[in-house]
From Swiss-Prot:
Location of region: Disordered: 35-62, 255-309, 335-380, 403-507
Organism encoding this protein: Saccharomyces cerevisiae (strain YJM789) (Baker's yeast)
UniProt xrefs under Pfam families: TDA11
Residue positions, PTM Phosphothreonine: T239
Biased composition (Basic residues): 473-482
Domain of life the protein comes from: Eukaryota
GO CC list: cytoplasm
Name of the protein described by the UniProt record: Topoisomerase I damage affected protein 11
Comp. bias intervals (Basic and acidic residues): 293-304, 406-424
Amino acid sequence: MNKFDEFIESNEKDLDVDTSTRNSIISMSPVRKTGRKIRSASSNGYRLEHHRTSSAGSMHSQRLMTPTRLNDQDHPLQAKTDARRVVTRHSSVSVPNAMSKRRSLIQPMVVPTTPESQNNLPFGGSVSHSEGSYGIPLESTTVLSSEQAMASGLRRSRNGSSQSVNSMIATTIPTNGVDVSALLQSLATKELELLECKQKIEDLKKQTQHEEQNYTRRARELHELKEQVSKHLDPSLNTPVKNRAFSPVYQNIPLESRTENAGNSSLPSSVSKPKNMGHQSTNQSRSVSPQDIQERRQRDDSSDSSKQSLWSKPLALFNQFDKIIQHEIERTLNWDDSLSGTPEVQEGTPTSNSESSAQQYDNEAPGARQKSPSQGSVSRSLWSFVSDVKAGLLGIEEENDNDVITDNRCDPVYKSDRQHEQKKSTQKITNRGQAEDSGDDSSLNMRKFKTTTKFQKDNAGNNSLTDESGHRTREKKSKRSSNKLSFIGEPDNDNSSVKNSVEMTDF
């Protein structure tokens, strides 16, 4: 040995570092620093040799560990046992630096270990400290792969996480009647949550109210804009109400819409303006205004008046028909009375409309009372109607009165005999029809109209009257003082006719 080798060995002893070549693992102990003795395991078929190279390249015969056969372990990129070196606490070299030798381009991930795990690492199996040597069983020297290291790390992390979760559960779940502070804390949190929810509800309500106000305001603005547009498009809306009837556009508008617009314009408000159908459809969803109430009232009144007009038309027809009949009766009877040629002076006040009309007609000139053929046909049809009405009225009076009237031959005729009276009336009607068709006015079998005043005057004179043909009439005794119409007929085939009285008020 030269001085250089001695210097190296001395430094190795001082630093407790082995600078030998490949396949040498040094386990250093702070207690003993004696010579090295490595127990070989001949059963595995290895020769243990150790050699040291000097600067001169001389080989020193030292213990070497050389495999007896060549295998995959001799590959230069294979992880060797010297890659893992166990370093004590007193060593100056750290563990990552000791394992930082690179054997390939792909370096496995290194998991940091704790001091407790370092004692269990099966790098070289169990390190045996013998006197003066470090015993390492080579058959138990294996290297941990990266997968095993990762699995052990995950297992430890799982254990740690499970322990932390168990500790959290133990703190959150209170014991029965012991952890009151946790209960109070949970109660306070629940109350705070309820208060927050209530505050959110109030905020939402305020927001909805604000949105509703904005909606109503925008709807009002839209309505005003529509009114302005309608004014610009339809100039007839800007014209006064009096001049609208002359505009051609206003004449095409229905009557109902005119009344509605007139009602709206008469309201004492500056905002009241005529509305078209589109505006009314948009305003239906809004609240009812006083204008709408007045419009509805006007419509109801118009509907009531239309209903009343439906009933008034038939009544007007009946009244008109009644007036026509009354006028024709008075005119015909007055004309018959004027044929006698004895006009009489009007005396006193008339007791009814029939007396006044009859006296006025008697005072007229005889030339104005000429009968035309059309008047004859009208009088014939009218007399047939009057005779039917008279027959019905006489039948009722005959049942009530049961009076007996005598004629010139003093033959008693009872009013209860309705068939006899109807027979005579039909005969007289046919005779009058024949006379009128022939055009002989003097031979008409017409009955004369006599009032109570005339009847009293005749009774005061001769108590008898002569008609146009010179026949003598029947004597009469009036039992009633009321205003009645006396129909006096001509004698038919030397047979006296029956005199019947009908009140004018019955018509």
